[in-house]
């Protein structure tokens, strides 16, 4: 009997009295985006075939033919010679049809005890597991680049901001280490997400399992899964792992976006804290002087794109009854694009950070503005017995006086300072000016997590050790 798969193109066409319309074929086909799953689809099929042979469900000869045919198909795909067909819907049926054309009936036996429902769920998990590992490596590369730049700038002083107003002096190295912490949490989330990705759905079949004596644990071991999905209904319909990964990716991009905003600000000529290498910037078609930080700007924009993919996946799943529904075909494009966007962004940012030129003089000049050591003066008074709230009020008055005169606290003479702060004049000595220097301010924050240069160097060392584990 002629196979329906080859007579009409669809694996299920014997049930229907008329062929699918061309419009519906285009509307329902996924092959031109899910073909990126081809190699993991082959890996999953080979593991399934080996299990079928071990369980005496197919013969050793069938297995040998399947392995031979899959090797040829894999080569065709890798060389770009495989002919993908819209009529065959998706990556799975394209490969199965080619296998059957190469080896005959043995190819038709491969799908025994399996549905495309558990097959695609397995493929996505296999593929995503590898991509999570790749993204983990890229996060490590970016953290390494940030640590190098932080170490080089452990003593470089810049203004720290709250509300985008000058707050207190910090070191540039300390500032960069904040992003190392963010990306470290991202790496932890990716590793944690991987544990839930790494469960095998294969064996759930369409939704209820299969009557064949399969060995799911053997397949899981072959494919490197930590275990199997425990419920067949959940196994084929679950996309939590894709949502969780996309949520973790949205956080990665949020951290990249925050960093991008600062890079754009720091590179502005009105700030001038850094310069980004030319190879990461573009010019203007009309303004000859322009050097635009397009990479961080685009990263900000692409963050919204990944956030949108997260909402798309959440919305995709919210109304689905058990078990598998065709809606789930729409999981792939958001997931694929999220992976591509995050991976490309992390790779380019690691390279860009390594090429940043720091301008310490501009940073220092900015830190000298805005009364960044006012808190240090308040702390000075507290250490001499004044309650903090009283010290805060006294220094706030001194700041207002200096602001009216257009000078900084450190520009006052000792006599002027005592004159402006008569209620605490007896507490103020010549040593006060050591507290009002930028170097004195940052050096005084000499505790774990503080901005003192020694703490920055210690934090860099600890972070490098953690990266190496």
Curated annotation (Swiss-Prot):
* Subcellular location(s) per record: Cytoplasm
In which pathway is this protein known to take part?
Amino-acid biosynthesis; L-arginine biosynthesis; L-arginine from L-ornithine and carbamoyl phosphate: step 3/3
Q: Which SUPFAM superfamilies match?
A: L-aspartase-like
Which reaction is catalysed here? 2-(N(omega)-L-arginino)succinate = fumarate + L-arginine
Give a Gene Ontology cellular component term annotated to this protein.
cytosol
The enzyme's E.C. designation: 4.3.2.1
Report the coiled-coil segments: none
Name the InterPro entries on file.
Arg_succ_lyase_C, Argininosuccinate_lyase, Fumarase/histidase_N, Fumarate_lyase_CS, Fumarate_lyase_fam, Fumarate_lyase_N, L-Aspartase-like
Q: Name one Pfam family in it.
A: ASL_C2
Q: Which GO terms describe its biological process?
A: arginine biosynthetic process via ornithine; L-arginine biosynthetic process
Specify the enzyme's EC class, one word: lyase
Disulphide bond pairs: none
Q: Which UniProt keywords apply?
A: Amino-acid biosynthesis, Arginine biosynthesis, Cytoplasm, Lyase
Write one Gene Ontology MF term.
Answer: argininosuccinate lyase activity
Superkingdom, natural source: Bacteria
What PANTHER family does the database record attribute to this sequence? ARGININOSUCCINATE LYASE
The UniProt entry's sequence similarity note says: Belongs to the lyase 1 family. Argininosuccinate lyase subfamily.
What is this protein identified as? Argininosuccinate lyase
- Protein's organism: Burkholderia lata (strain ATCC 17760 / DSM 23089 / LMG 22485 / NCIMB 9086 / R18194 / 383)
């Amino acid at each position: 009997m002629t196979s329906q798969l080859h007579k009409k193109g669809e694996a299920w066409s014997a049930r229907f009295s008329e062929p699918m319309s061309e419009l519906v074929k285009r509307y329902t086909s996924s092959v031109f985006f899910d073909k990126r799953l081809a190699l993991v689809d082959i890996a999953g099929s080979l593991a399934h075939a080996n299990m079928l042979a071990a369980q005496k469900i197919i013969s050793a000869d069938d297995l040998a033919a399947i392995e031979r045919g899959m090797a040829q198909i894999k080569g065709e795909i890798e060389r770009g010679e495989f002919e993908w067909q819209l009529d065959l819907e998706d990556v799975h049926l394209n490969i199965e049809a080619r296998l059957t054309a190469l080896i005959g009936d043995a190819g038709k036996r491969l799908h025994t005890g399996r549905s495309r429902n558990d097959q695609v769920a397995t493929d996505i998990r296999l593929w995503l597991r590898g991509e999570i590992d790749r993204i983990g490596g890229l996060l490590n590369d970016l953290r390494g680049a940030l640590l190098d730049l932080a170490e080089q700038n452990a003593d470089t002083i810049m203004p720290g901001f709250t509300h985008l107003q000058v707050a207190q002096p910090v070191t540039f190295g300390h500032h960069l280490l904040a992003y190392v912490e963010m990306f470290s949490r991202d790496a932890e989330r990716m590793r944690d997400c991987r544990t839930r990705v790494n469960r095998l759905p294969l064996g759930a079949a369409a939704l209820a399992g299969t009557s064949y004596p399969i060995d799911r644990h053997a397949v899981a071991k072959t494919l490197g899964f930590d275990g199997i999905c425990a419920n067949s209904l959940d196994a084929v319909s679950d996309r939590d792992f894709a949502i969780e990964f996309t949520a973790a990716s949205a956080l990665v991009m949020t951290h990249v976006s925050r960093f991008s905003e600062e890079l754009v600000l720091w590179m502005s000529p009105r700030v001038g804290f850094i310069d980004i290498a030319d190879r990461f910037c573009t010019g203007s078609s009309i303004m000859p002087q322009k050097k635009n930080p397009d990479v961080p700007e685009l990263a900000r924009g692409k963050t919204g794109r990944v956030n949108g993919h997260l909402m798309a996946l959440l919305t995709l799943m919210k109304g689905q009854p058990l078990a598998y529904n065709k809606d789930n075909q729409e999981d792939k494009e958001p997931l694929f694009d999220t992976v591509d966007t995050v991976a490309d962004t992390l790779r380019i940012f690691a390279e860009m950070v390594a090429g940043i030129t720091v301008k310490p003089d501009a940073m220092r000049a900015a830190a000298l503005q805005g009364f960044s050591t006012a808190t240090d003066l308040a702390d000075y008074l507290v250490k001499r017995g004044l309650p903090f709230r009283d010290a805060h009020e006294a220094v706030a008055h001194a700041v207002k006086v200096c602001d009216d005169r257009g000078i900084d606290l450190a520009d006052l003479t000792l006599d002027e300072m005592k004159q402006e702060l008569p209620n605490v004049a007896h507490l103020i000595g010549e040593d006060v000016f050591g507290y009002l220097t930028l170097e004195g301010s940052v050096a005084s924050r000499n505790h774990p997590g503080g901005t003192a240069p020694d703490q920055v160097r210690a934090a860099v060392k600890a972070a490098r050790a953690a990266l190496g584990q």
